[in-house]
Amino acid sequence: MNDTIILVSEETLKDDTGQRYKSEVQTDELLCELGSITRSEWSQANQAGYEAEYEVELFFLDYAGQRTAIFHGKRYAIYRTYRRGERIELYLGTRVGEIDAE
């Protein structure tokens, strides 16, 4: 594994007044391996409203269902996963029409 990724999840917390709010929780940098997006994957992602950007593979035990990742300094949606034994493939993309605010 020759690259790193940060996985992001949300948790709902309560403040002192009992109001609920969402807070982001980021993992430490995790080792991953960069794969490639096939033409078929790109097409399927596009039909689902995503622009496919990357496929990364990491150890299955490092993944806990997060829906967002930070890869090479940019935030991506995890729009699909595929388990391969002890590893899992995460497919990263952006929503079609979404403007990057970073």
Regions found by a protein language model. Name each.
Residues 1-21:
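Active-site-proximal polar cores
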Residues 19-102:
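Short, conserved turn/kink motifs that form compact alpha/beta structural patches or helix kinks used as
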